[in-house]
Amino acid sequence: MTGDDRYTVISADCHAGADLLDYKPYLEKRYHDDFDAWAATYVNPYEDLLADTADRNWNSARRLAELEADGIVAEVVFPNTIPPFFPKASLMAQPPTAAEYTMRWAGLQAHNRWLADFCADAPGRRAGVAQILLNDVDAAVQEIRRTKAAGLTGGILLPGVPPGSTVPELYSAAYDPIWAVCDELDVPVNHHGGSASPPLGDEPAARAVFMVETTWFSHRALWHLVFGGAFRRHPGLKLVLTEQGSGWIPGVLEMLDYYHGRLVAGGGPPASQFWGGRAPGVGRGPRRVWGG
């Protein structure tokens, strides 16, 4: 490049969402009364979403102006505000129980509809990331198809599955229809840092422990999908690990290759003891998977 050339800067990790009450038109009408009752008593726990600057999450003109002032011309848009029927930001929420699922799923679908309109307001400059839940795989697959058709180009946000969750771990074959449709439609699977940590309680040290451990819990998605065979069955599947740094990747790939070689490729007693005859389902070594 010469000194006169200009870089194109795209942010791969921006966040946005609607103001709380503005989600109502995007909800199915059968949930409107429930939404009114919930919104009337809901107290937002985030100071930044109560401040005068909160509208940068949903004010399209302001957002474009501020991004351009920073030299950014386009963005990948993750969620940031509170969708209907959630206690806090959906990115950090635990997987819903069976009793919570129906309402929260309706809330995420409302966000996805809002996001499609928000992205359409700046064509080619916003790659919206659609949200799904893992409780109902068939419903998630339908939503992936719908949001792709609606113009959301940032992929899906893969929810975290902390240990002890109400849904299967990410290596489970139950999620194969999700990987299949993402491969078919060329939909990236985004896993954002902070979304897979277990609840830590209210002890004074909990916040510090969360900050130390949160990226590690998010890293787990990589080896779950590798050893679960998702990339073998769906070679076009793309996993994006966001807000997790990158310095950890070489060491983790070395570790994963070690266990792949010992428990899978070796085929000896360790494979019989620890892998239960499932070695062929994993496919290539982790480093080869990473390299494409």
Positions of PLM-derived features:
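Helix-coil boundary/capping segments in enzymes
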Residues: 1-292
